[in-house]
Amino acid sequence: MYSSIRLISSRLFLAFLSMLASCPLLLAIDIPKEHIFVFERSTNTNYVCYDINIEGDKLNQSTPLNAYWVIGGGRRTEGLTFFDRKMAFGVKVVSSGENEALVHLTAYKDLTIRICKRDGTWVGIVRWNGHEMILQKMFAQMGGSLGMKCEYVDVYGTDTSTGQAHRERITP
């Protein structure tokens, strides 16, 4: 008897999942395809997404990246707060040109990100410990009593010379 109930429950669950898969409004994540990288933290599932900012067909020189929070597993987005922009996740332009910009995050000035086109796609390229890689994600491991102390940041990307996945760890 219990096995038949489990079988019915499993079938109902699978039917429910297939219904969800056919409903794009329920599963849609509002992240544009032109994002350069994301910044995740260990404290929760919210993350900051960095998108390319194009005006016409040229890179916006004063604001080459748009940064915003993706909250609740992708259910909604919010702009960065003043504190986020000035102290942590904001983008500072070091230099810019028509199709390239050098930027860094306000929290860490030692990692310069070169925004440029590579094979027709906008990417962020970082150089760290002799490796040049196309940036995909940064992950901050938070600690301390309130979870406000950054223990390390892992930088993930694809090595430009080998094409292999690569990770570098930054310890503040």
Located regions from the model:
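Mature extracytoplasmic domains of secretory-pathway proteins
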Residues: 62-132
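Charged, amphipathic alpha-helical segments
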Residues: 128-143
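Short amphipathic beta-strand and strand-loop transition segments with alternating hydrophobic
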Residues: 36-38, 54-55, 88-93, 140-144
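Bacterial N-terminal signal peptides
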Residues: 11-24
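N-terminal secretory signal peptides that target proteins for export/translocation
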Residues: 1-10
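N-terminal export/targeting and maturation segments
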Residues: 26-84
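Short, exposed beta-strand-loop hairpins at the edges of beta-sheets
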Residues: 143-167
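Short, solvent-exposed mixed-charge patches
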Residues: 171-172
